[in-house]
Amino acid sequence: NNLYIKNDSVNPTFSFKDRPAGVAISKAKEFGLSAVGCASTGNLASATAAHAAKAGLPCHVFAPSNIEMAKIAQALSYGANYIAVDGTYDDANRIAAQIGDSKGIGIVNINMRSHYVEGSKTLAYEVAEQLDWQVPDQLIVPVGSGAMLNAICKGFEELEQVSLLNNVSNMHMIAAQPHGCAPIVDAFKKNSKEVIPVEYPDTIAKSLAIGDPGDGRYVLKRLAQYNGFAEECNNKEILDAILLLAKTEGIFTEPAGGVSVAVLQKMVEQGKIDKNDSVVCYVTGNGLKATEAIMEVLEKPKVMKANITEISAVVN
């Protein structure tokens, strides 16, 4: 009765990345930078390219070559210089950092990161306002680099500092990661303060396939601070969750959102979330950006002749 989906699949480029990208590129424009760019698993590529186009700045995207075609097409449509790196996200991230330093480019999630993360705080601001300034009991956040979870915590803390919220310390943060790229979950379950990188991520949730999460240690601190948990889910559980959300709420999410929903189900089954708790589940991207992941489990449409009798027989 108290489950809420924070649906960021309806933003300008159909993911939450419009929030941090918009802030970072606005600051790049303010600083007088001549070009911007990003290292990306897909969604940030689209968002950075779109906001750069609006700002009139050249954009350079560095991304693994195996991300979803829809995300590549989006970034290219906005006019980005798209560099498909034959390697992992961490390889693309390393190269983007080096290029940014050597050529004076504002890489939004690297040398513009302090401004970039501020944009994601609005995920806390909006949820608080939409819940009539009540703090939810549980927040489930899909985690790649970990920057979003950390920013959400910061956003709630700032609202408490200006007396718009109370009892923020009572909320529980849950980090959701896909099996095959869950270094933060692994560290949490081992009660370790160090995140050991995953060298070769292997998951259908490509937007979360960040083997060496830049904010991983901060996420572990936030989980400790907010009595949280970290949990993972496999590809089948992700696909099942995508279909569940689509069929019950009419929201078609990409696999990252499926990770949130799948982990929610697990936490309820494990008794870590009570059915009476108020729960916010973050859905961070649109399913149309990653249709390859879901097509294999969908029933193929049956092609029929344009005959009213035959078609009427299959419409119950």
Name the predicted role of every residue range.
Residues N1-N316:
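PLP-dependent amino-acid enzyme catalytic core
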